[in-house]
Amino acid sequence: MCLESTTCKEKWFLDSGYSRHMTGKANLFTHFEMKKGGKVTFGNNAKGKIVGIGQVGKKDSTYIKNVLLVDGLKHNLLSVSQLCDKGNRVTFKPKECFVSHMEENKVIFKGERVNNVYTIDLSSLTNQGVECFVAIKDDY
């Protein structure tokens, strides 16, 4: 699904169909715990093995907690429901999207729509004034 192979390293796809934040790239984790067992089911009913859970992003500023590492997953996926469960509002517009903290009414990050897919580039979030980006804790 990467549209430009040179810039897809930290592209994250936002969608309401994902139940959890997930990636297949172990090198993105700044903190990681191995997990035994567990699978995720994709839209085509294929299953992916959960290898572990952890934190991805910048160590001191922008990060996402409770991201699953799924064996063989080719894309980085952000769950809209997980974002909302953490007290955020996700707003989709024709060419962009915004995630805002509802209590502080502060934009956490801005994404863009390219070829009908909303994405954010985690590596550029610090340029948008992002301080912290977290997800809910799951029992895995």
Annotate each language-model stretch with its function.
Residues 1-140:
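Residue-level marker of conserved, structurally anchoring positions within well-ordered domains
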